[in-house]
């Protein structure tokens, strides 16, 4: 989503710097056939965040590069006839172990995710696939996660458990410590009239019983008392999360999408995007994303891949 370069180093800049200290993540880029997607992959590679393998019609990639003066250098290109074939081949390369990350190019999100979700040939795991917005909100101290605002439309309790765990795992993997997680609803009291409040309470109990690990959960919380200390104090809510939430878990996709876009367009927040729960992290970018937001998406995914790589080495 849109943003502007700030005058001072931002939360994104710190994430990008941390990722540059790691080895580049081999990234399968599906159909980068416009200036934005191809240029973003090349710039991320030049910054040392990723090593891209470009999967698309080779002639189209070379035409885009020539038209926009993008230096392909010696980048590996896997030639396929069209965008659908690019999505299928990109997923196949991940299954073959060729890449640590999957990155969306200029094809439609649904086209890529259809291949990712395929039962026999996709990238599903036992965990539910979910999306996280990694937000840099001007004037807000912490990086802010919003989930799920792009994949799961009306998630049930079991899906929400995975959505929460995916977000916690990402927060920890990119080196931000133990997150404070707010399960959002319209109110902060449990009421049968608002089902999301009951699910919020259940998720908190699941965390108490070890069914969700790695974060501190509180809910239900309304948005104001999740992120504003004074609002939490007025409501008499005393917890480590209230007023200090770092991960916001929304009731459904509509609420999450509106929240993320409100922050983007009213506060000029940046919103990097990542899909988790598949075999590898998936970088989902929008045509409206700024260069820095695209780099931040790659950086977060690369940090996640680096932590997984380190864990695999330690396990040997």
Curated annotation (Swiss-Prot):
GO CC entries: cytoplasm
InterPro entries: P_Ac_Bu_trans, Phos_Acetyltrans/Butyryltrans, PTA_PTB
Keywords: Acyltransferase, Cytoplasm, Transferase
DNA-binding recorded as keyword: no
Enzyme Commission code(s) on record: 2.3.1.8
Main location: cytoplasm
Pathways per UniProt: Metabolic intermediate biosynthesis; acetyl-CoA biosynthesis; acetyl-CoA from acetate: step 2/2
Gene Ontology BP term (one): acetyl-CoA biosynthetic process
Entry keyword DNA damage: no
GO MF annotation list: phosphate acetyltransferase activity
Annotated catalysed reactions: acetyl-CoA + phosphate = acetyl phosphate + CoA
Signal peptide as annotated in the record: none
Ranges annotated as spanning the membrane: none
Localization (cell): Cytoplasm
NCBIfam families according to UniProt: PRK08190.1, PRK11890.1
Family named by the database record: Belongs to the phosphate acetyltransferase and butyryltransferase family.
PANTHER family named among the record's database cross-references: PHOSPHATE ACETYLTRANSFERASE (PTHR43356:SF2)
Name of the protein this chain belongs to: Phosphate acetyltransferase
Record organism: Rhizobium meliloti (Ensifer meliloti)
Source lineage: Bacteria, Pseudomonadati, Pseudomonadota, Alphaproteobacteria, Hyphomicrobiales
The gene coding this protein: pta
């Amino acid at each position: 989503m849109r943003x502007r370069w700030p005058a001072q180093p931002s939360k994104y800049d710190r994430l990008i710097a941390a990722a540059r200290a790691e080895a580049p993540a081999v990234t399968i880029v599906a159909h980068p056939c416009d200036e934005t997607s191809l240029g973003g992959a090349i710039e991320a590679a030049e910054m040392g965040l990723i090593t891209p393998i470009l999967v698309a019609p080779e002639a189209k990639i070379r035409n885009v590069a020539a038209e926009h003066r993008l230096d392909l250098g010696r980048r590996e290109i896997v030639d396929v006839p069209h965008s659908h074939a690019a999505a299928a081949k990109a997923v196949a390369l991940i299954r073959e172990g060729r890449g640590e990350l999957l990155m969306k190019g200029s094809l439609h999100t649904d086209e890529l995710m259809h291949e990712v979700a395929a039962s026999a040939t996709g990238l599903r795991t036992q965990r539910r696939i979910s999306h996280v917005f990694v937000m840099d909100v001007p004037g807000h101290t912490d990086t802010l996660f919003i989930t799920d605002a792009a994949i799961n439309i009306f998630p049930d309790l079991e899906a929400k458990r995975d959505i929460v765990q995916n977000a916690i795992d990402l927060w920890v993997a990119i080196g931000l410590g133990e997150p404070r997680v707010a399960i959002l609803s319209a109110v902060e009291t449990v009421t049968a009239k608002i089902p999301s409040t009951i699910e919020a309470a259940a998720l908190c109990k699941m965390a108490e019983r070890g069914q969700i690990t790695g974060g501190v959960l509180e809910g239900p919380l309304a948005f104001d008392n999740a992120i504003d200390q004074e609002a939490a104090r007025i409501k008499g809510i005393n917890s480590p999360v209230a007023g200090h939430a770092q991960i916001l878990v929304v009731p459904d996709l509509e609420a999450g999408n509106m929240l993320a876009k409100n922050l983007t367009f009213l506060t000029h927040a940046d919103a990097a995007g990542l899909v988790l729960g598949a075999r590898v992290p998936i970088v989902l970018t929008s045509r409206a994303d700024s260069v820095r937001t695209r780099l931040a998406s790659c950086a977060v995914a690369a940090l996640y891949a680096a932590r997984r790589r380190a864990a695999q080495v330690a396990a040997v």
